[in-house]
Amino acid sequence: MDMIFKDTECLLFDMDGVILDNTYDNNFWQNQIPSVLAKKRQISFEDAKRLAIQIFNYKKNSKDWYDLDYWSNMLDIDIEKQKKAKESYEKIRLYEGSISCLEKLKGKMKMILITNAHRKTLNIKLQKYDLSPYFDEMVCAHELHYVKEDVQLWYMLRSRYRIDFEKTVLIDDTIKNIYMGLSAGISKAIYLGNEKYASSNKILSMSSINDVPSAFN
């Protein structure tokens, strides 16, 4: 482990599924929006959910998938307002140990949050848990015109923020994002996802964010 992360100068942190759990987002798109859509179109919740899934899947892994303004226009629903609603907002939750992890790593190297979340979504989450003191930059992939599943995003990130990828570690819960980052030149990665994935010479698989600081001791 010490060999893998020797000379790390920059950490790229994902947010959802790494620092925050996915309850908020999953419930919002799978339950709250179909419920609003059902009332708006006077159809059953089940029909609204099927319709929503069909519409959402059409844009999966694209820039529009994460764009609140796009979905507000597409569904004729104020998505930002719905995301701020109490029944949704209260579901924003930190993973246990995430703040402790950030506190242990802050100051040891440059820390950058890189998320697919729209800036409006990020701001809502930061209102509940202000993560900004732990990061040198908080970057929304949307504003670089790509998503993390696209290798071009990583090239844009490297250029915009002058990151030395040879001394950078990416922490993410989506293996495709990790592969794209590595293919763009990122040296190493920590995978915190649910899929079973064996560690390699470039990717260290961990079960919890609590374990991350030990990789940099």
Task: Give residue ranges: language-model regions.
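Hydrophobic residues in well-ordered beta-strands that form the structural core
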Residues: D21, L113-T115, Y191
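Asp-based, Mg2+/Mn2+-dependent phosphohydrolase catalytic module
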Residues: M1-L11, E103, H118-R119, N123-N217
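Substrate-recognition element of Asp-dependent hydrolases with the DxDx(T/V) motif
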Residues: L11, I79-R93, S98-Y129, V139-A141
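N-terminal helical cap/lid subdomain that shapes the substrate entry/recognition surface
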Residues: I4-S100
